[in-house]
Each structure stands twice: as structure tokens, then as C-alpha cells.
């Protein structure tokens, strides 16, 4: 897996600019609503990343729409195009469940993959660019950062692209996660993490092991693209996001110890927020416009107190917005879809393709095509999708089709649903399952149902009737008409060729 190498975010921006994938905006633009409007229009048109050099009221530039096209996501992962992300998925599938070598030759063949992983621990630096400027105590003022307000009814400015670094009390490896953070004071943010996410689990374990003690936490903004994307990729629990970022980049991830705690953050990050969560300190978060296209309801989450801000000289603030697809998370979903396919195929070799339509909020609906081998096979695959990766815990609908259907073409999928399904026989309903608390359609916050649709051809045992045979064209006739097609001049305004 040959990787394009970027040492930091600035390296990546330089390459994007050289390829016409970055636009500098010198006109003053307000982080309150205006940047969102410009970024949204640009993303919908397949446009470039945007660097707002003069946000109104601030001296720090704002980077937006960085991963606004699948191509830029692939480039951030060190690949030339989206199709190459299948190779990233194959590597992750191997790391998630490596098969023991079948013999000496197989061991020799697998050795490069093992060496790749073993050679990718982090590189710890004594000093780092992210600590060129340091403020602490009363000098900490988050209002100096051009944090965006994305939608008219949002509760407050919102940090969206922060890499939250945590470590549980019984773990050597750190966790990297991306959780939105509402600004509620000059040194206070609300950490919105769902209970099953790595940061929340680390915090729960800390509270159990150290009652009443402050939980150390750091947030990195503007890390290199491989590290950012490593935090949103289904990395095996045995592999750190930093090590995975090193695999993508082809070089070890450089980290530095924080000023105020023992956590390690990306050395090249533009900005780092250091601080703690006081056990029991909670605050109401929201409402915010989110990836569903609606404002979510208010809920309580822990408060993150910032004690130190470290940053690079001339730091860049990296931000985004979320809204009804398409938005940047939806684009990320389209690209990461290619990573998921080999991981699922490793566990379920019968899967031909897997697709998360972006219009389905990137994870709430999945279409799977399989090489069906027995009656009931589609139901096994549904259950597998819901249970195998925690990324699909909140997928509400799974549609399973045969491999003659294109999972990415709604014409094909709807044809299969309407011709191969009996609603009563082929619909699976599962009640009282975990659901994203942002899903207001569920009857209870965080708990709802799931639906599986078996749109495959039915086998003996699944139906008593003779099954329909698809219409297929006569290949000889097709070849003959191909040969005389131009002479027919049907699309040539009636003129002879």
C-alpha cells in the first residue's frame, strides 16, 4: 500500500493548493452562520477546501470543507483515489482478525504486513510545533478562537473537528475520538460523547477506579490528515489510532507529552486544549442542527475545563458543519464505505458489496448484496451487519439483495424490493435495540427498533411457489442490433448516417 506522505496539515494544504483543491478566501467572512453558508454551497458543487484568512473579529484563519470530496478523503489517507481505500480496508480486516500462517511460505507472505504494524509505534518528541505558544490559567480564553456557529437556532459556537485524547485507568493505549464541544465559557466546553464511544468508556472506567478525581483530557485541533482520519476509521481495539495513522502515512506518528497531563497529542497539531473533567459536573448541551437535517433535543453531558491552550505560530483553526446530507461527514461516509467492504467480507465472504447511502444519514440504512447459498441466508447477514462492527449499532434498516443487483443503484434495489419481497414474510423487525439518541423518531431516547428487508430470490423452504425467471436478452440479437445500430439513425434527427 504505497502512501502519499504529509508531515502535517500544512503539508497537505500545500499539495491541495498545487492541485487546485484549496481556495484562499481573503474577503472578511463571519464565523457566525456565513462560513457555513459558503462551505455548504461549495461542498454541494464538489468544490475545493476553503481557507478563510480573515474571519470577522479574529486574527486566526479558519479551514473548512477539508474533506468535502471523496478524492480529498482518499488523499488524506495517503491514496490517489477512493478505489484505493479498499486496500486500506483489507489491511484493517487483516489486523482485526489475522489468520495464523498455513505454512512457511504463507508466513513469508504475511511477514510484510506484520512488519508494517510492528514498525509503527509513535515517535515521542521532547518539543513540538504544537507547543510554540502556551497560555494557561486566567489567560485561557476560547473566545479568541474563531469557533463557528453553524445554524440559526444553534445554542452556541461549536467545536466540530477536535480530536479528543483520553486514556482509561487500566489501559496503555490512548483513545482518539471526535466529539462535538459546545462553548459555554472562556475556559469551558461541553463534551458530547455517546456512552459507547471510546472517550466515554475511558471516563466511566476512570470514575469507577478514581472516585472524585479529575479526569485528564486533551483535544487536538488541526492534526495531520492521516491522524484525523484515523480517528473516524474502524481501527481494531488492539491498534492505536496513532499507529494506524502511521501505516497510512508510511512514517511513525510524532507525538508530544502535554504540558499539564501525561496524554500524548499529535506534535504537529495547530492547537491543543488541555484540561480535565470534574466528576459530576454536567451541563445541558444543544440544541444543534446535526447530520439528520434537524435540531437535536437538549441533553446533559460532562463539562471539559480547559487549563492550557498550546498552539503553533500562526495557527489555523480546522472546523466543519453538519446538516442534512450532503455535508462533510456524509462525504467521509461515502469514502469510508470502501474501507468497510473488505472488513465485512473478511467475516462474511458471501458479501459482494455493502453500501451506506449518504442520503440515509450515512449509517442509518445499509444495502448489502450477497451470493446467496441457502434459505434464511439474508437474515443471517442482517444480524451480522448489526452485530459485527459497532459502527453499525445504530443502522435502522438493512436491505439484503442478490448479487445481480447493484447495491449503489436505487433503480436496481427498488426493483428487487418490489419483485422479490413479501412484506409479511420477508421483513424482520427487532424491538428495543440501541438507537442514536439524536434519532427523535424512536419512541424512547436511545432505544428503538430495527428493520431488515430480505429482497433476495427465495429458495425452497422460503416459498412454496414457482419463482420467477428474470428476462434475459438473446445475445445473438443484441450483437446483430449493435452492428446495425448506426444505420438505424434513431437518434440522428431522422437523417441517414
UniProtKB/Swiss-Prot annotation:
Pathway: Cofactor biosynthesis; ubiquinone biosynthesis
Cofactor info, note text: Binds 1 prenylated FMN per subunit.
Cross-referenced SUPFAM superfamilies: FMN-binding split barrel, UbiD C-terminal domain-like
BP GO terms, sorted: ubiquinone biosynthetic process
The entry's keywords: Cell membrane, Decarboxylase, Flavoprotein, FMN, Lyase, Manganese, Membrane, Metal-binding, Ubiquinone biosynthesis
Catalyzed reactions: a 4-hydroxy-3-(all-trans-polyprenyl)benzoate + H(+) = a 2-(all-trans-polyprenyl)phenol + CO2
Gene Ontology molecular-function annotations: 3-octaprenyl-4-hydroxybenzoate carboxy-lyase activity; metal ion binding
Lipid bilayer topology: Peripheral membrane protein
Cofactor(s) for this UniProt protein: prenylated FMN; Mn(2+)
Function text: Catalyzes the decarboxylation of 3-octaprenyl-4-hydroxy benzoate to 2-octaprenylphenol, an intermediate step in ubiquinone biosynthesis.
Family: Belongs to the UbiD family.
Protein name: 3-octaprenyl-4-hydroxybenzoate carboxy-lyase
